């Protein structure tokens, strides 16, 4: 076992200092290395990959917090995370923005506190300020060390949970269209389904062997954006123009959705509510501890040949700062984005295509030569998001029908489901053994029953997490279930599985990434 696996540093703040010392010598090259052709497509790819889900999340929070949050708040949160982490973080490849889980957290807090008559934004600000303190304590006490216990077991459960949240949000958006009449609802469902089919087709063809490599990459990078543009205008064809579809609500440029200041007067709240915010802040800290660190781990996946060191402790300390600032500004707290973080690294990969010819067929395989590790792409997409808050672009965003965002939720959800390890395990278990490759990884397990048991445990974990989200006001506790999965995997599962089987089924992604630090 590597020495790093055994040693926990008991000197407060030492790991933060080590993170900064290791990354600082590369700071100049982080900007010089940005002079590469892969940076521009990475900027555009991540800008749209970040923007489109955030518009959907903005619509969700707008509806469920009585217009407290809107497009500008979500965009500003994305700018805060992108710019701060691009300039100061140890791992600038990790994309930071507004996630699905934080939207669930924010509107659940609203539901709980609204009934008590507690002012929402001051209370949310105190949640963020307390969470900032807890982030500092964890980072200074070298507590991010325990990210080494995060494995694919809990990551895949969380990924499946987020995917089903996307699907649920899409359905909820369409259900909301019922208040505009049956004709409006029917057209909305039709457009959402068409968007799903076209978006799914772009993704499938982009990952296939059809057409040339450049065409496939073009479909993967910009197919979803083109679909949104097309279906935003689709409603104006023929008699469909007679149906007035509900649009994405926007506000004035650089102004909050509600008539308020960007600075939250957090002192205008009863003292009791200040301390009542502590348990909520603990839950938020737990969510960010898992969500952000998993995002960072996935951005540094072993499949990416990264050469520059990262730093978990300094980045978590930095996340505490952005969490506190977001509370003061009255915006959703940004953190690591699980789909976008590895997508960003993948977009910066310099690849070559190797062809393997045999007597029967010709196959091709993409090989990653290196990754363009730099800060500019994250920083530039943050500046592009600032531009999105201007009046003309907000007017453009206002033209997007809500049903298109519902279709976007579905595309993200189904893509995440079919790319999830749990789904792949289920497909393997249900497949005909005669047509499954003999070299398939799961064939090396001691028995098929082992794969069944492992997958069933994952589905139970997913079911518990998703079920608590469906319970009003109790849904705020879903990060606790996610956290409990880590000790369950570490201490309980080794008693039920052979070590050799766990090595095949459950890669320890946390320790692999942490060893690079």
Curated annotation (Swiss-Prot):
Record key words, sorted: Membrane, Transmembrane, Transmembrane helix, Vacuole
An individual GO BP term: monoatomic ion homeostasis
GO CC annotation: fungal-type vacuole; plasma membrane; vacuolar membrane
UniProt entry tagged with the keyword Membrane: yes
Transmembrane feature ranges: 68-88, 93-113, 121-141, 155-175, 186-206, 217-237, 269-289, 311-331, 377-397, 403-423, 449-471
Main location: membrane
Pfam family, one: HCO3_cotransp
Subcellular location: Vacuole membrane
Membrane topology, from the record: Multi-pass membrane protein
InterPro entries: HCO3_transpt-like_TM_dom (IPR011531), HCO3_transpt_euk (IPR003020)
GO MF: active borate transmembrane transporter activity; borate efflux transmembrane transporter activity; solute:inorganic anion antiporter activity
Record's keyword annotation contains Transmembrane helix: yes
PANTHER family, per database record: ANION EXCHANGE PROTEIN, BORON TRANSPORTER 1
Similarity field: Belongs to the anion exchanger (TC 2.A.31) family.
Protein name from the UniProt record: Putative transporter C543.05c
